[in-house]
Structures are given as C-alpha cells and as structure tokens.
Design a protein with these regions (language model features):
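N-terminal Rossmann-like FAD-binding beta1-loop-alpha1 element of flavoenzymes
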Residues: 2-27
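Residue-level detector of alpha-helix initiation sites
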Residues: 9-10, 33, 186, 324
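Active-site substrate-recognition segment that forms the wall
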Residues: 17-21, 44-46, 78-81, 179, ...
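Conserved FAD-binding subdomain of flavin-dependent enzymes
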Residues: 18-21, 31-85, 94-103, 228-230
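Flavin (FAD/FMN) cofactor-binding and adjacent substrate-gating region
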Residues: 69, 77-150, 155-164
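Predominantly flavin-linked oxidoreductase catalytic cores and closely associated redox partners
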Residues: 128-216
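C-terminal catalytic lobe of FAD-dependent flavoproteins
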Residues: 281-364
Length: 364
C-alpha cells in the first residue's frame, strides 16, 4: 500500500510511525524541514485529564498513555519527564500578600505572584522537547521503511472514474499513492483547493526559551496574568529537562504566510515575555535568552481536531486542527489514523467526533 503524508510535523510524523508499525512505509512530504513550525516551537506540555467531559477526553487519555510507551519504543532522549503543574496569579496592578497560596511549593519563584492551585502532578502531567520528539518519531518511522522527501505539493490528483486519489504532484513530478493524508497544521487550508475540507485557521503565538544559570525544578506554571491595562493573559512556563525554560503567552493577528519559513517574529512581544519571566523568578531574570520564536497553531471553527477520512474521495484523509494539544494528542491520532488507513476503521478510539464532514467545506 502506497501512502503519502503531507506534513512532517508531529501529527504527520506520528502517523508515519504507527503506519511503520503495521509494515507500511509511508512517504512524508515536507516543504521546509521536520518540525519546522508549531511542532518545533511548542511548550511540549502533556496532560492526561484536562479534557474530561469533552469529546477529546478519550484521545487525550490514550495519547498520554502512549507517550509513556514511546519513551521506551523510540529509544532516544527527547526530554520526556513527568512534572507537577501549578496555577499562578500575577498582576501589574495589584500586589498579593507574601506567603499566601502554595508559593513555597516551587522554590525558585519570587513573591510577587501567588501559586494557588495544583493543576496536575506526576501521574497526570508531563513534558517533552517538541522538536526532538517529532524527529524521534520520524526517524523511527524511516528506520522501519518510511521516507522523508522535501518538496512543495502542487496538487492532489484523483481518478474521476474510481473517485479515488491517485497521487500528488510535488515540484512538477507525479507521485502515485493509494492514500494521501493531509497533516499540514494550519497550512492544511491550502488543501481546500483540492479536497472538500472545512476551514482551518492559524492562531499566532510568541514564545521564548531561556537558559538560567541556576537549575529550576520540574514544575510547570500556568499563569493568570493581569497587565497594566487590566488585560488578562494566560502565559505558560515550562522548564525542560535540558535546563532551558520555555515561556509563551502573547498572541498576534498576522495572517498565515504561505510557508512556515515566512513566519515573522515580533521582538516586542518576545521582550514582554522576557520581562514577565523576571517578574516570576529572579533566577529567570538573570537567565540568558536563547530564542525568540513564533508559530501558528491549527484550529477550526469548533476548536476540535479534524481527523478522519474525507468524504467523497476514497483514499483521502486529514489530521489537523489540534490547537495547543497537538504534541499531546499526536500518538493517539497517529495510531487511530494508521488503523483507519490500513484496516478500514480506527479501533483504538472513536474518531466520529472529529469527522471532517461535521463542518461545511470551505469551498462548495
């Protein structure tokens, strides 16, 4: 069976990995590089039970458990570890009483904010380095028969008689396929010109990574931050196993560029994050800035993933729209998609809540 996956982010790489476990060596097409967009610039935070009562709950719990299995199966260090996770309040307009809340639980924080709730412990929350994890998945897939090919997809070809995909055109060359999977993150929007897909949008966010002189503990922080204007933000601060600290929290409204290579970085937004880091911790105030980053998270109209077969064209599939939970839900998505493609149905989870045709196609 010839399978082509368009996109070498974490979702496409996970699908390639689980297909390889079934003896199917997919061809992964990527315009830029592995994990070149959000899959290389996310926080890599994982939570098992933060979607309880929502359609994503089954997917999240399956994926969290698969992450544990993958630490042994991939046999490479990508910074996976369990963490404690706290909620913290911080304001530029008012102060909090010293010693309140759970602030003493995280010993590298200043006294300006208040840690007021344990959101998860080492049984329910974890963290990894997103780019290294994505590369580990794709490397394992390629070792088992998959291949990565750099190029720009120009069209998806269909056999009108059989009403089935026949392949794709990449940089002017036709590649035949029995199945084609759209896993291009927010750039899956480009595929709406070839297939009846719903609109996929890109939400832009900024992040920085810091290298502190003093190591910090494995405690993730989700902030409720009030700025001088009274606006509320939700920064996330994720220490990594390699000693770096990741911080995100401000968004932008720039339109999605044609290529991930053209994503612009707003240094003003990143510098705001730098100042915020210093408010949270003196250790972070003295840290070296390693990177300023920006990326677009894929999201659709109802903020749910779009995963499954594309109606009307046999052999056409899509897996995108995971928003901020792509790194978490990649293993479950990859496993279910591999089952759907190879066996005709997903047996690990019910994909019905994520069916592409639950939403109207962008192009009628």
């Amino acid at each position: 069976m010839d399978v082509i996956i368009i996109g070498a982010g974490v979702i496409g790489s996970a699908i390639a990995y689980y297909l390889s476990r079934k003896g199917i060596g997919a061809t992964v097409i990527e315009r830029c590089d592995t994990a070149c967009a959000a899959s290389g610039k996310s926080g890599g935070f994982l939570a098992r039970d933060w979607c309880v009562g929502q359609p994503q709950d089954q997917l999240a719990q399956l994926s969290f458990d698969l992450h544990t299995d993958l630490t042994d199966a991939l046999a490479t260090d990508y910074g996976y570890r369990r963490v404690d996770t706290y909620a913290m309040a911080l304001s530029d307009r008012r102060s909090f009483a010293r010693g309140t809340g759970l602030s003493t639980a995280v010993n590298w924080l200043n006294n300006e904010g208040v840690v007021h709730k344990l959101l998860g412990d080492t049984t329910t929350t974890a963290q990894l380095h997103p780019e290294r994890f994505t590369r580990a998945l794709l490397t394992a897939a390629c070792t088992a028969g998959a291949q990565l090919r750099l190029g720009t997809v120009e069209s998806i070809e269909r056999d009108p008689v059989k009403n089935q995909v026949s392949g794709i055109t990449v940089d002017g060359r036709f590649l035949s396929a029995d199945a084609v999977v759209i896993a291009m993150g927010p750039w899956s929007l480009l595929a709406t010109q070839w297939l009846p897909l719903p609109a996929i949008y890109g939400l832009k966010g900024y992040s920085i990574t810091l290298s502190p002189n003093t190591p910090v503990t494995a405690d993730a922080l989700f902030l409720d931050y009030e700025d001088q204007l009274g606006e509320r933000h939700g920064p996330e601060l994720i220490p990594r196993a390699d000693g770096e600290v990741y911080l995100c929290g401000f968004s932008g409204d720039d339109p999605l560029p044609v290529s991930p290579e053209d994503v612009s970085i707003d240094d003003t937004a990143c510098n705001r994050l730098r100042v915020l880091a210093g408010r949270v911790s003196t250790v972070l105030a003295e840290a070296t800035v390693v990177q300023h980053q920006a990326c677009y998270r894929p999201i659709c109209e109802d903020a749910m993933p779009v995963v499954g077969a594309i109606q009307g064209t046999r052999g056409a599939y899509v897996a995108t729209g995971h928003n901020c939970w792509g790194m978490l839900n990649a293993p479950g998505t990859g496993l279910a998609m591999a089952e759907l493609i190879s066996d005709g149905q997903a047996s690990s989870i019910d994909l019905a809540p994520f069916a592409p045709d639950r939403l109207p196609p962008l192009r009628q």
